[in-house]
Regions:
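Conserved functional hotspots at enzyme active or ligand-binding sites that engage polyanionic ligands
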Residues: 1-117
Length: 117
């Protein structure tokens, strides 16, 4: 891969083969790893994206105009995975800095770095 993924980009990921309740098939994911790691490592860290809308504090809603996706979706920061960059098929979109800040807050909640109030 010549162009490495960058934090805040949405990529189509080939999740196969999946195990248990992991994502399956080809689905979008948000790159959440820092860009130094994205440039140097053979892996990246992503958060799964789904059109199955469930409003939990760890989920971030994204509209099509914000994401490059066709449907209203959620970023599931409770499903953070390290994947090989070989699984990345194509870039679909880029989040705004404001939306990335929402994701940062949701990650803190998901990892227990901040309390739910």
């Amino acid at each position: 891969m010549n162009n490495f993924p960058r934090r805040g980009e949405i990529w189509l990921v080939n999740w196969n083969p999946a195990r248990g309740s992991e994502q399956r098939g080809k689905r979008p994911a948000l790159i959440i790893q820092n860009d130094i790691g994205n440039e140097k490592a053979p892996t990246t860290i992503v958060a799964a994206i789904s059109t199955s809308i469930k409003f939990y504090p760890m989920n971030v809603k994204i509209e099509p105009h914000e994401s490059g996706l066709h449907d209203i979706s959620i970023i599931k920061t409770s499903q953070i995975l390290t994947i090989s960059k070989i699984r990345l098929e194509k870039k679909l979109g880029q989040l705004s800095e404001e939306k990335i800040e929402e994701v940062n807050q949701a990650i803190k909640l998901s990892l227990g770095l901040e309390n739910l109030n």
